[in-house]
């Protein structure tokens, strides 16, 4: 599945969670990279929500951390046909349903010179 979406600013909460060893170690082990402490937030058209929710609900990749932190489902993905990473689906989130959170080893706004409003493609 390949979806075009719009880059937007998040709430900055992912930086804290992606700095926790149990998340970092699991992503490194299962995805092959140590994630940059933050996500690239992408708003996708609502017409894709049924397919995204199906992928999320059927996803078997899950990190269940220590008490006090929420579980995270993830699926390997690519951004703009060039960056390998993953889309994360945190059990606890404040984002709307049509937000995808993409993680990678690099700060993608810098690496790809992205700004709010830019269009990106996400494939998973």
UniProtKB/Swiss-Prot annotation:
Key words, A-Z: Flavoprotein, FMN, Kinase, Magnesium, Metal-binding, Nucleotide-binding, Transferase
Pathway: Cofactor biosynthesis; FMN biosynthesis; FMN from riboflavin (CTP route): step 1/1
Positions of Mg(2+) binding: 39, 41
Keyword Kinase listed: yes
Cofactors required: Mg(2+)
Record EC number: 2.7.1.161
Cofactor note: Binds 1 Mg(2+) ion per subunit.
Catalytic EC class: transferase
A GO BP entry: FMN biosynthetic process
Binding residue positions for FMN: 93, 101
GO molecular function: magnesium ion binding; nucleotide binding; riboflavin kinase activity
Catalytic activity: riboflavin + CTP = CDP + FMN + H(+)
Residues the entry annotates as binding CDP: 10-15, 106-109
Known role: Catalyzes the CTP-dependent phosphorylation of riboflavin (vitamin B2) to form flavin mononucleotide (FMN).
Family statement drawn from the similarity comment of this UniProt entry: Belongs to the archaeal riboflavin kinase family.
Protein name: Riboflavin kinase
């Amino acid at each position: 599945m390949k979806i075009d979406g719009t880059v937007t600013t998040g709430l900055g909460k992912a930086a804290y969670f992606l700095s926790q060893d149990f998340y970092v170690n699991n992503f490194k082990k299962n995805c092959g990279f140590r994630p940059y402490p933050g996500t690239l937030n992408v708003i996708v058209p609502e017409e894709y929500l049924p397919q995204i929710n199906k992928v999320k609900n059927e996803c078997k990749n899950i990190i269940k951390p220590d008490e006090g932190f929420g579980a995270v489902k993830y699926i390997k993905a690519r951004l703009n046909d060039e960056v390998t990473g993953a889309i994360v689906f945190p059990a606890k989130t404040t984002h709307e349903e049509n937000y995808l959170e993409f993680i990678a080893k690099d700060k993608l706004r810098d690496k790809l010179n992205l700004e709010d409003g830019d269009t990106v493609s996400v494939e998973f």
